[in-house]
Amino acid sequence: MSEAEARPTNFIRQIIDEDLASGKHDHIQTRFPPEPNGYLHIGHAKSICLNFGIARDYQGQCNLRFDDTNPVKEDIEYVESIKRDVEWLGFSWSGDVRYSSDYFDQLHAYAVELIGKGLAYVDELTPEQIREYRGTLTAPGKNSPYRDRTVQENLALFEKMRNGGFAEGTACLRAKIDMASSFIVMRDPVLYRIKFADHHQTGNKWCIYPMYDFTHCISDALEGITHSLCTLEFQDNRRLYDWVLDNITIPCHPRQYEFSRLNLEYAIMSKRKLNQLVVENVVEGWDDPRMPTISGLRRRGYSASSIREFCVRIGVTKQDNNVEMAALESCIRDDLNENAPRAMAVLDPVKVVIENLPAGHEEFVAMPNHPNKPEMGSRQVAFSREVYIDRADFREEANKQYKRLVLGKEVRLRNAYVIKADRIEKDEQGTITTIYCSYDAETLSKDPADGRKVKGVIHWVSAAHAVPAEFRLYDRLFSVANPGAAEDFLSTINPDSLKITQGFVEASLAQAEAEKAYQFEREGYFCADRVYSSAEHLVFNRTVGLRDTWVG
C-alpha cells in the first residue's frame, strides 16, 4: 500500500490521537464484525479499510469477528468468502478468526447476571404484541404484563428457554429498562430469542441465541476493543451498548463511534435486495461482475488498490451522502491507466484485405506495452495481408470530424502502416463483409514521404494470427441513481447492463491470466473472466470504459 493510502485524516483518527496523547489508551484495538449472511460489498470495504487501516497505522490490532448469532440466515460459504475478500483487499487480522458464538457461554452467564439484578425478564408476549406494546416515536410504550416477575421466576423460565421448553416465538428474554424512553431501542429490548436451528459453529448445542445489541458490546469488551466503529444507523444503539456494559461485571468498556455509511449511486447495498437479485436470477450470483460485492468487483477487473483508494477519497464523516458511481470508476481508470499493459482487440470485426501485399505476407511490428512506461517493455505483433478492424471504424461516407477509415481515404493502423480504402464488398442484406485496401509500404510507424497528412489512427489484429474471443460489456446494473427509493427496485434494472459480442484479440492474449487487467486500445479496460475464460474459449470482461459515458 502506498503512503498516500496509509494516512488519511478523519474525525475518528483525531479521537484516537487524543486518546493516545492523554494516556487513555496505550494501544489501539479495532475489529471488523460482519454477519456471515451474504457476500461483502463496497460499503463493507469502507469499514474494512477504516478498521484494518487504523490498526495498521497505529501499530495496533484488528480482529476479524463473525457476528454469527442468527443460524437461520448464516452459512460457512459466507464465512469463507468474507475471509477471502479481506485478504484480497490487502489486510490481515490479528490472531485467529473470531466468532460471536465463541462467547455464547459468557453471554449466557451475563444474561443470568442481569436477571439476578432484576434487569432482565422472560416475556411471553408474542412478537406482534411486543411490537404493539413498544409504542411509536411520538407515543410511549407500555409495560408487558410479564415485566414484574420475580428474579427466581425469570431464572427458572430462562433455564426452561435454554432447555427447549418453549416453542419459537412464545418466549424471549428482555432487558428491563424504560418503556417510556424517548429512544425506542431502550424500551425493554429483546436480548435472547428462541431458534431451533443448527448453527454452523456450535451445531445444536443452543436453542436460544443472543441478539446483536447484546452480543456486540460484550464481544467488544471481551476482546479488549478500544474503539468500536460502526455506521450511523447504530447511533441510538450506543445507549443500549453502554447500558449493557454498565450493568454487568466486565473489566473493559469500549466506546462506540459512528460514521456515515457508503451510499453508492446506481447500486443497491441492502443484503436482502442483493440476495433477491441472486435468488431471482437477475444476476448470475453474488460475484456477478455487475454486483457491488467485493467479489463481483474483483471478477469485473477492479484492483484491490483502486478500492482502497476509493475509500480514501470518499473519506470518513458523520454526514450521510450519496457517492457518484463515477468516483469509483475514476479510481479504477486512474489505476489501470497507470499500470495496465496495452493490447489490441476488435470487438465487432470486419475484414480488411490489403491487396498490394502478397498472399501469405507476414511481418512483425514492435508495440510498446505501455506508451509512458518503457520499463514495461514491448512485444512483437504479427501484421499480414488480412486484418480485422472494428466495424465502427469504417464508413462509406463521413464528414471531416470522422477521423477513421472512409472509402477512398486513408487512415493509419496503430504502430503499422497507412492504408487506403479502395472498395468494399457487401452481402445480400447490405452488410459490409470485406474492405479492400492498399497500403503505403514507406509508412511503417512514420509519416508519408510526400508530406500528406493522415490524422486518424485505428487498432487492428492480424486475421491469420487473431484469437477468437468473447467480450462481456458490463455497465451499471440500474438505470436510476437511487434504485432503492423505487417502489419496486427491480423495475429500475438497466436492460443494457450486459452486452456480449464476439471478436478477436491479438495472439499475445491467447493465454491471458484470469483477472489480469489490460487496456484494449481505444476500447477500455478488460480482464479475462475467472469463471468462463479458458484457453479454448477466451472471455473478457469490460471493467470500465476509457471515459465516463454517463456524464450529462
Swiss-Prot record:
Subcellular location: Cytoplasm
Tagged with keyword Ribonucleoprotein: no
Uppermost EC category: ligase
Motif 'KMSKS' region: where in chain: 268-272
Molecular-function annotations in GO: ATP binding; glutamine-tRNA ligase activity
Subunit structure: Monomer.
Protein known as: Glutamine--tRNA ligase
Organism (species): Pectobacterium carotovorum subsp. carotovorum (strain PC1)
